[in-house]
Amino acid sequence: MKKIILTVFAATSLLLYSTPSFALLSVSVGMPMGATVPAKDSDGDPVWDVDETSGYFIGVQLPFAVGLGVDSHKIGLKNTPTRKLATDIYNIFYQLPIPVVNLILGLGTGKQTVECPTCAEGTMVSEVYNGETYSYNGGFKPGSVTQWYTSIGIPILPLFDIHLSYRSITSKNIVAGGDTKMDYSSTVTGIGLAFNF
């Protein structure tokens, strides 16, 4: 019986020491590395080709393994170089108590807007086509988004880890031209560091 108790105590001590999921406080910062906007037109071709991504991810994990975070990033689009897809999301996440790696699952909600010189809601755009001038509402009304994400971190030293993340964002209610709902759902991958105190 003493051997069993000693073995359980030793194993528990090693597990608690080897993972920072039991840290009092953890702060993580990250940035997007790549993104896709998989919307397709009626021919099955991609509507948006991603040019670049920028922004940040911040998360603070509380002592009871639940954390809060914020994502703010922009996705540049190749086929419309002046247009960017701007997303701001607030997250709640949970770190699974797994030894050796830090696995996080999270959910978030927020808003998404299309940014460009003629993208403000209510902007009228005029174009000449076959010698005739046409005017239309070229603005975009911001929409709400939801996301789920996961992050896997590998401890480098007891005080910090490096992690990779994958975010799946659902956005199907940005209104273009006054009445057309657009599908700007996307996926974003990122990299970051977490500091454990």
Task: Tell where the protein language model's regions lie, with residue ranges.
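Outer-membrane beta-barrel "beta-signal"
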Residues: 24-26, 154, 184-197
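Membrane-embedded beta-strands that build the outer-membrane beta-barrel scaffold
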Residues: 58, 68-72, 92-94, 105-107, ...
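Sec-dependent N-terminal signal peptides
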Residues: 4-13
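Residues that define the transmembrane beta-barrel architecture of outer-membrane proteins
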Residues: 46-56, 62, 84-92, 99, ...
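Outer-membrane beta-barrel translocator domains and adjoining extracellular loop/strand segments
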Residues: 37-49, 73-85, 114-133, 138-140, ...
